[in-house]
Amino acid sequence: YGEAPISVSGIGPDYVDLTIRRVGRVTGEVFERYEGDSLFMRGPYGNGFDVDDYKDSELVIIAGGTGVSPVRGVAEYFSHHPGEQRGMTMIAGFKSPGDILFQADFKEWEKTMDLFLTVDGAEDGYEGRVGLVTKYIPDLNLKDASSAKAIVVGPPDMMRFSVKGLLERGFLEENIWVSYERKMCCGIGKCGHCRIGDKYVCVDGPVFPYTVGKNLLD
């Protein structure tokens, strides 16, 4: 049935959390036939978010949908080590209330950070926030945007407009990191499936500083 790139959303002493979205043949097969079985996994490949880059700073995380998965580790780390930074805010967006991932985590994280949890649309009577993640960028409570750090993960258009909003708020390009989700195959930079310009997402990324990443949006 082939292979599929999967986001690592958590690591423990003897386990790894994977966030799998059912979107095609391979992931559909995992959901249908292999519950409780052992599957072959290779990797991890590429880079990740280094928490040292965000220590002693105000940090803003903007994530859309399954884009929350790769930033879950950063949020979890600073929720347990709040003294290592100057303040943290997360804006997380989902299509609908039923699509919200990691609900238990959000309840814990909001104890140590400002949390904007929003959905694109909801039925009448929904009491949470409704709107795109960019709607809440003007509401960020920051002491100094020019020294704050930001992580943005999600679909290309969402990342493009989120970064635009951050720059308008006074963030510097060198203080913004983006992560690209692009179809990967070999994982070692040989097949070219994930090539954007002269970069290979599986080798050079998927995390890029925006000074590099701004030239890679496709």
Q: What are these model-predicted stretches?
A:
Residues 29, 70-73, 101, 161-162:
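Phosphate- and divalent-cation-binding pockets in alpha/beta enzyme and binding domains
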Residues 43, 63, 90-95, 117-119:
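Short, structured patches in soluble enzyme cores that scaffold and shape functional sites
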Residues 96-218:
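Reductase modules of NAD(P)H-dependent flavoproteins
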